[in-house]
Structure formats: C-alpha cells, structure tokens
Amino acid sequence: MIKILLADDETDSRDAIVQYIDWEGHGLELVGAAGDGAEALEMIKTRKPDIAILDIYMP
C-alpha cells in the first residue's frame, strides 16, 4: 500500500477528507492527519509516508 500523510489546519476540511475517501479501496494507507506544519514534519519523520498532501496556506 502507498502511505499517505494529510496536513490541513482547518479541522472540518481535514476530517472530511479523512472520513470520505476510501483509502484502502484505492490501495492507500492513511498514516496520519496533521493540524499544522510542525506536526506534519514530525509525522513525516516518524511515519515515513510515500506521499504528503499539504494545505499550502497553513501555519
């Protein structure tokens, strides 16, 4: 499976993306959902995702 990390500072948007995408059905594993850039960086270091989906207007 391809490991995905999601980062978005808007909780509603982040939760909707996490909830409504059939990650496993697309051969993906969601390894984390971060609420800010610092949290995303830590998750990238420890969880080693193949792809990071980032909100570019995030603190």
PLM features: residue spans?
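Two-component/phosphorelay signaling modules centered on CheY-like receiver
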Residues: T11-G32
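Short hydrophobic beta-strand elements that form part
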Residues: L5-L6, G32
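Non-catalytic signal-transmission and effector/linker regions of two-component phosphorelay proteins
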Residues: M1-K3
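Receiver (REC) domain active-site loop signature in two-component systems and cognate sites
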Residues: M58
